[in-house]
Amino acid sequence: QPFSISGKQGGFEDTRGTLFFDVAKIVKIKKPKIILLENVANFAKHDDGKTLNTVKKVITDLNYNFFYKILNASDFGIPQSRKRTYMIGIKKSYNNSEFIFPRPINKDVKLLDFLENKINSNSPVFKNKKLLKKKEVIRNNCLFNFLPNKPVRIGIINKGGQGDRVYDPIGHAITLSAYGGGTGSKTGLYLINNKIRKLLPRECANISGFPKNFKLSDNPNVSYKQFGNTVVVNVIQHILIELK
């Protein structure tokens, strides 16, 4: 949140933003071969790039080569639009060559395939005939099979705020968030089986790359916050493959 567009963008003036310097202290003492950092996409241009340059200088002064790139989970087999800034520090004495971030795997996936069959949720469910009709128009469109891997917005409910936007699960999910308001807070709203609802905690785990045996908190709000703050497993896996 210190660097997020949806937050106040306090950056290093926010106490959470200064955690990086604690990480730097650990790196200085432990001297790991590789450092992997992740932050919101806006981190790369926060304060006109000064924040990123500060991180780069600190890392390079510790005798590491520094690389960064914005990657989207949607490009790595996960139906969630989640752009994040990934930063890599590689100790020069370990490997002084250029690091190349993984390329998109261009795998067509849909949120629909990551949903749970059994629904046991206290989340409100809505019906909206206009959205049902719009959904059919989209799905019957001759260009439908050529839709890019991204969220497909089909309408709104209530006042139409960010948390009131409704999406079709034939596309990708919007970015899971640890915060936010509105009816679809933290997950967004989706027209599923002709009903409008939020995603379940388990579905949030699914679109974050977590295995089915990953144990969820008994408190749904804890899980929503957890997946709003998490890194997507698939993206990290592809980065680690390139680091081998």
How should these model regions be labeled?
Residues 134-244:
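C-terminal target-recognition/interaction regions appended to catalytic cores
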Residues 1-175, 181:
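Class I S-adenosyl-L-methionine
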